[in-house]
Swiss-Prot record:
SUPFAM superfamilies, per database record: Small protein B (SmpB)
Cross-referenced InterPro entries: SmpB, SsrA-bd_prot, SsrA-bd_prot_CS
MF annotations from Gene Ontology: RNA binding
Keyword RNA-binding: yes
Listed CDD domains: SmpB (cd09294)
Subcellular location: Cytoplasm
HAMAP family, per database record: SmpB
Origin: domain of life: Bacteria
Protein name (Swiss-Prot/TrEMBL): SsrA-binding protein
Homology family: Belongs to the SmpB family.
Keyword hit for Hydrolase: no
PANTHER family attached to this UniProt entry: SSRA-BINDING PROTEIN (PTHR30308:SF2), TMRNA-BINDING COMPONENT OF TRANS-TRANSLATION TAGGING COMPLEX (PTHR30308)
Any Pfam family hit: SmpB
Native species: Lysinibacillus sphaericus (strain C3-41)
Amino acid sequence: MAKGSGKVLAQNKKAGHDYFIEDTIEAGMVLTGTEIKSIRAGKAQLKDSYVRITNGEAWISNMHVSPFDQGNRFNHDPLRARKLLLHKKQIGELVGAVKRDGYTIVPLKMYIKDGYAKLLIGVGKGKKDYDKRNDMRKKEAKREMERTFKSKNQY
């Protein structure tokens, strides 16, 4: 199965708008029982979340996982930091990438693969405002071209 494939449960669409994603890595997550139940129900958000590396371990912060409806007193904190499961070599690559100018680690999407929740994280460089405007112009031009082809093909 390809990297990033499986049932997508949450996506960070803003990451593609705010960053030039250069490399992606698949990571597992350490979750509690109520967290995985909420995630499978589609109650997770990657918006404004980020990955940081402390003491040789990767952690995702600010990822919101809503409390499980039937979780009662065993429920989890919705915004707690969750450990990512990566090999040491992968963590070393991420540390090296972050030390370069302007690079950051952003979560791209969360999905289920072979029964396990996985997180696709990307190493990206922040876009400037003019880069975002150029991307918007290109998308608009592409849409316009498709519209004209579509109208010419109808007779």
